[in-house]
Amino acid sequence: MTSSKHICMFAAENDVIPGAKVGGIGDVVRDVPRALADDQTRVTVVIPAYGAFHELPDAVSVGTFTTSFRGTPQRVEMYEVSIGRDNNVRYLVLHHPLFAAGGKGQVYCDDDANQPFATDANKFALFSVAALSAITSGNIDSVDVLHLHDWHSALTLALIRFDTAFESLKSLRTVFSIHNLALQGIRPFAQHTSSFQAWFPHLHYDSGVLADPRWPHCINPLACAIRLADKVHTVSPTYASEIVQPNDPLRGFHGGEGLEEDLQQAATQGRLVGIINGIDYPAESAVRLSWQKFTLQLSEELLSLIVRQNTLRTVDYTAHQRVLAEAQRKRPAHIITSVGRLTDQKMALLFQSTRDHRTALECILESISGRGLFLLLGSGDAELEEQCQQVASRYPQLVYINQYSANLANLLFANGDLFLMPSSFEPCGISQMLAMKDGQPCLAHSVGGLRDTINDESDGFLFKADSLNAQAEALVQRVNDVLHLREQKPDTFTRIASAARKKRFEWSTSASRYHTELYS
């Protein structure tokens, strides 16, 4: 690079800041700036303070400015959070009472089904205009590239296009990253307190540029960003090729989620780019523990989580007791692990019925009875949590841990034999990379980033089929085949595990492509 460049990122999450991560976007916003920053590049990352992060011990006030929202001036405070020693990376949080609408420190709100995204849309509409005002007021200086993440910051592109207050920002290069295409932030144009005209009553705009392709009376922030950004970025090449196709529920295929025509146009114009995410690699790999040490650490970590809660939940007690019981036995022949948020995306195939009316999860559990253990770590959707708990009550070979902690996840990554990731769709995925890093091969659905990171029977295992039922059947069959391989050809399985451990998804490689394919 021949000249200095300043990249400014707007996002809803940033895992550098304690408590500011909910999903995978927080990991990416944590890691990408560090990989990008060098002597020629500085990066500024901006998120809302959510009523909490401006109060962190390392947060220092660095400015106050006003922005226009709902037709009135709004005072916004800006704080810099100094965490770690990230040269040429600056972390900012914006404070305004509306950003704490869901409660102090709550990143997202859970609105009623009859008004989806209403509270979050208010919050992120203000965040979008406030973050832009931080630039035009001089509180963030000399920006060259504006990099936006998901629908939460997508409205900034509409404001740059139609609000004369941001006329000076039209020369900025803009990049929009899609981490979750299913969440689009759709709201009415008008006649609601959470609507585009309620937020920006002074604006004269072209509704055709901003409208949802299915509901023309609604604004779709994600569609708007896809149409207006200089580059549209997805977090894997295969996912970029999938989302230009329409969804096909009968085939169990997740594509463009209604925005495929906009994405097709972006692809035709050369604006759609797929770049795989990366992970960090420590100097030394995690050490695989003996069965006694593993179960001891697992039970201790579980107990520490339990004692922090006000009440003892049945699901936690059951998991802890099951781990204690397993500690008294020999190590099972096979330890299957899975780590992730409990969402339809991650769990639908496990609960899909097979031809004998059992779910795929039940079939897998019955196939490992007496010879294996399935350790499932995750929380999320309440109905899915209940389903997992019910299955665990019937199958002692399932240890369902309805929690999340990095320590528990790392224990499972480092000590399992086969990592299961049967996502219905997967923009990139990070859990499979973390398991592979520790030498645990992954068995995954051949979609999106899973297909891009796993080579079947070389460093992991893939399955695919053309309907939901067939996908569930293929998942069960593949698990059985892999466990049979592990029993009958242990040298082959060990070779695959070794290849998984050696595979690398370096952020430096991805960052180089960011510079050449997104920012130039």
Report each predicted region and the residues it spans.
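Catalytic cores of nucleotide-sugar-dependent glycosyltransferases that transfer UDP/GDP/TDP-activated
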Residues: 1-520
